[in-house]
Amino acid sequence: MIKIIIGYVLDLIIGDPNNPYHPIRYIGKLASNMEKLWRKVFKKNLKIAGFFAWLFIVFITFGVTLGIVHIANKINPILGTVVSGILIYFCISAKGLKVEGLKVIKILKEGDIVKARKQLSYIVGRDTENLDEEAIVRAVVETVAENMSDGIIAPLFFAGIGGAPLAFLYKAVNTCDSMFGYKNEKYKDFGFFSAKLDDVFNYIPARLTAYLIVISSFILRLNCKNIFKIYKRDRYNHSSPNSAHPEAAVAGALGIRLGGANYYFGKLVEKPTIGDAKKKIEISDVYKTNNILGMVSFLGMVVALIIRCILEVII
């Protein structure tokens, strides 16, 4: 249990360390190497190539993490707990998510919209060159809302079930989707299993995140009446079966509209809207979303501890 608290507190204090030695970056390097290898092995069947790449990436990551934790526990149980806590910390990005969004808003408030667009491009996939202030703020809110699941709640959820090794396994799944889960010509076959299996792994965390956003909205005295209506109506308004769940909850809590049309690689992509435009999206909505994020991450840690307690009693 203490290892989950260590991971949560370290993220709360330090945040996401932006350096080339971050363990998650090594998963990315492993993924690149596995892609090259399995594309050569199965040149004529890229779906199979992608599946084997996914399998090796995920289980190598899990095995290495399990080995590190096992060795640390063998040396000293306290060391094992500390190492596990640090590894869990590397899987959580609550503070990093908040900080990156606020960087965009700080620049925007200074009046440099060109620089704000550039900063936004580091955290979103859409084209940002022509976005106005409202579109920039909307993009930040959407990014924070969507990533509450895969950046915070999902790692904590899997850490609660299986400690650092399972949290890292999840991050490997998520990394595969981030790198391969595109519908373009290069990855539509190779990334097929990465995208589908990411949906499977995020099924429970995405819905759990939405429920925690609802609870957080009650605690923070936001629009609790509207949140149920919007969540029930719009939770599937996305090409992903999971992404709209936290976004719909946030949109309902703030009384704003998210989603809609965006440009990706120069092409206009029409997406369903999420929420009702009861008011214009403002910079203050980013701060409110960050308040929700803080409460959700705390509640997520509590849920992970409860899961761990239940499993320890059962097992």
From Swiss-Prot:
Entry GO CC: plasma membrane
Chief location of this protein within or outside the cell: membrane
DNA-binding keyword on record: no
Keywords: Cell membrane, Cobalamin biosynthesis, Membrane, Transmembrane, Transmembrane helix
Pfam families: CobD_Cbib
Residue runs in coiled coils: none
Transmembrane segments: 48-68, 77-97, 150-170, 200-220, 295-315
One of the protein's GO biological processes: cobalamin biosynthetic process
Bilayer topology term: Multi-pass membrane protein
Molecular function terms, GO-annotated: ABC-type vitamin B12 transporter activity; threonine-phosphate decarboxylase activity
Location(s) in or outside the cell: Cell membrane
Pathway: Cofactor biosynthesis; adenosylcobalamin biosynthesis
Purpose: Converts cobyric acid to cobinamide by the addition of aminopropanol on the F carboxylic group.
HAMAP family assigned to the protein according to its UniProt record, in alphabetical order: CobD_CbiB
Stated family: Belongs to the CobD/CbiB family.
UniProt-recorded name of the protein: Cobalamin biosynthesis protein CobD
Taxonomic source organism: Clostridium perfringens (strain 13 / Type A)
Taxonomic classification: Bacteria, Bacillati, Bacillota, Clostridia, Eubacteriales
Gene: cobD
